[in-house]
Amino acid sequence: MAKKKLPISGYDYVMPKPDAETIRKSIVYKLIFILGVDPKEATSHQWLNAAMLAARDLIAEDFLKTRRAHIDNSKRMVYYLSMEFLLGRSFVNALINEGVYAEFEEAFKQLGKEFADVCEQEEDPGLGNGGLGRLAACFLDSLATLRIPAMGYGIRYQYGMFKQEIVDGQQVEKPDLWLDQDLAWQFARPNKQYSVRFGGQVLNLGDKKEWQPSEEISAWAYDEIIPGYGGECANPLRLWTAHAGNLFDLADFNRGDYASAVRAQNSDENISRVLYPNDSTDSGRELRLKQEYFLVSASVQDIVARHKCRFPSIRTLADEVAIHLNDTHPVLAIPELMRILIDEEGIAWTEAWNMCCKIFSYTNHTLMSEALETWQVDLMGRLLPRHLDIIFEINAYFLNALRAIGNFDDDFVRRVSIIDETHGRRVRMAWLAVIGSHKVNGVAKIHSDLMTTSIFADFAKVFPERFTNVTNGVTPRRWINIANPGLTKFLDKHLGDEDWRLHLDNLTKLNDKVDDASVQAEFGEVKKAAKERLAKYIETELGIKVNTDALFDIQIKRIHEYKRQALNVMHIVDRYNKILENPDFDWQPRVFIFAGKAASAYYMAKKIIRLINDVAKVINNDTRIRDLIKVVYIPNYSVSLAQIIIPAADLHEQISLAGTEAPGTSNMKFALNGAICMGTLDGANVEILEKVGADNCYIFGNTVEQVEEIRRNGYDPLSYIERDSDLRRVVNQISQGTFSPEEPNRYNDVLQPYGDFYQLMADFRSYIDTQYKADEHYRNVSAWRKSALINIANMGFFSSDRSIADYCRDIWYIKPLSEKELPGRN
């Protein structure tokens, strides 16, 4: 142990040295004196907790030094608000970023423990579900790595979204008990508590308004450390949990009415129990709105309090603070900040509004109008009456300004109003975000272009300078360095150094070696090892044995109709039919792998999961197929599972209907790991195509323009079915019970041949034909490996470091901590 003076306080303290012997002693110390466990009796999980505490000691100094540097240098801060942060396991990521992974591995070797087994004990934090949360997590990693003064805000969900189990082919939701593990990684902040209020009434007191709420709960803070790569900067992710306060009714309890004694407490604390409560009921919608306001109220109060501690005047808030809204869930932050500035700080309405418009920025993640969040005016008025007042005032201010310009007719004004008067009076949250933000960005070039010509076309006429693009990215530290150790060694060797982890553009040097037979062979071994790892997982967890020489065809993402997992199933069924018709043909064996969760209230998505499993049951047990097709559904998709699946992919499916996917980031992760894309011209597929070339990915289906033209002309899916016998047979088999003989009509609504909103029938033939081209390509081993290497070599643009640099330059106007402001390690 080394005695050292902490730069931010002047106190002497003992700082553990990052060597294996010291770490070993620290782990044992934590086990005995912090956890109170005899090392001879300790479980692998207890060893993990001790190791995490030892690692936290090493990281805590960076964390506190970073915070002090922000304060001492009066740095402008960005605060990132998101309902989701899909972090994945933190322990190994932190050790690699801190540069002490080898030392911890050696320490456990000295202890006679298998380090990999200990690491496997860590649960994925239940803080997110899909791409929205994973993007936020990648951004946190890049913010810390790039030394950006930043802080994330989210909710500490007690039960996550849910743990997915597959029972009789169907999704069953179970509580995700991730908080049952000890949380060595989080610092409780009992001094950071804020009151979050609901309901009541608003009193008009002359030129002021006073909100008198009827309900109040407390938000308590926990800080998760996010260490940057290189171990110099660490930023916080502040997570809020709901506490009801002193609501336990002792009188009821003493009378034996135990349920009544805790009813109010349980009701209030439900706010932070589950991510995305089922909103198919009135009570579910109310809980979800309360959850969103809970996040923004606690976060905005904290942001204002932090500013007032650092700066003498609240009026400089817009100069020192940027608040970013990740999708529409946190958009209530706009009226919440207005409420604080006007009601609590005494700032005039117009000045407060001008401050808000400089502070907020908003990322849009969807082009589907039905997915844009809206809330009933009556519900918002009942739960948040003061905020509804402010929203009305914002809307009136905006619409009056439009009318004053004089170039916009009444119909235009109606379309851009925050209040939708045509569907039962609803507050359009995306509209509020656009009006209250100084920048609105899409997340892929095609998405940003479509954003200003479709859902926000009217606003683009009013605020043409407000809209911009920041193409998403992913962190190579997790998606190569952690997920794919074999590829990491391969890149270190052939790029000549480890610098690609921070400068992903360095991957382009690999372009010089894509034709080298020895390099191709070496890459083939890396891919084979990854496939064997996944095959072992599938056999261990599901009892299904797969052929690792087969082409691994993978679609892993949230289950949704627009993502078109059903089209993938249609291809599988068609291939099944063709093999039975022509068993002597030299077929390319394929393993089709699915993973992803369906929202608990999403009937059709859950039906698609069941269809996949029913098709798998029939095909996997048909001996005539001879393992030429194997279909696998892996339950409970998570970041940790993705880290096993993605490196093993040969082909990845990005097959959403053109014009519906914002960017997608799984396509970037797959390409970074040497998988080839089967996709439509949608989202980031377009930009990946530009980078890797048409010979190194498979594009099929109609373009955005063709999709729109088909709709304008009156899309008739039955006409496609009538003229394509293969398609007709597939539709009939699925809808008439070939894969569900015990319930023949089970899937007669899945393909919806009379509606087919996502145009599966229109894209079917192109999809099938393109799949056979991929078969031919895969059989040419050298050509396939060359294409895979070209994909890796040209993914440098898709680093989340580049995305964050774009945000800092073009949207947040944030500068990183300099070496002088936060000195590196000696």
Q: Residue spans of the language-model regions?
A:
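A conserved ligand/cofactor-binding region detector
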Residues: A2-N826
